[in-house]
């Protein structure tokens, strides 16, 4: 098994945080990765920010969906990685090595799920 990670961000009307979340993904040092962004048809400029990164995305769309889990499932359908990570809009990785650390610190041959801690920085 390779260790390609498909990272999925779902978003709806969060132009304030989408760029920070996307930049967090692009700063990751792990090379075997792809990024999928599912926008629920935002009307606040979110889709325009996503378009700026379109050539760096494995897949993205901006269309009405049936909610956050429908959007996540849409992303999973387009994922080609061995692992799937959900990076919600407004969230970001603790360091530029977060994905690499997750893969390197697991027994990839036996693990079904990789998880880690989170830290709430703003309310």
Predicted regions and their residues:
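Nucleotide-sugar donor-binding/catalytic module of glycosyltransferases
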Residues: 1-123
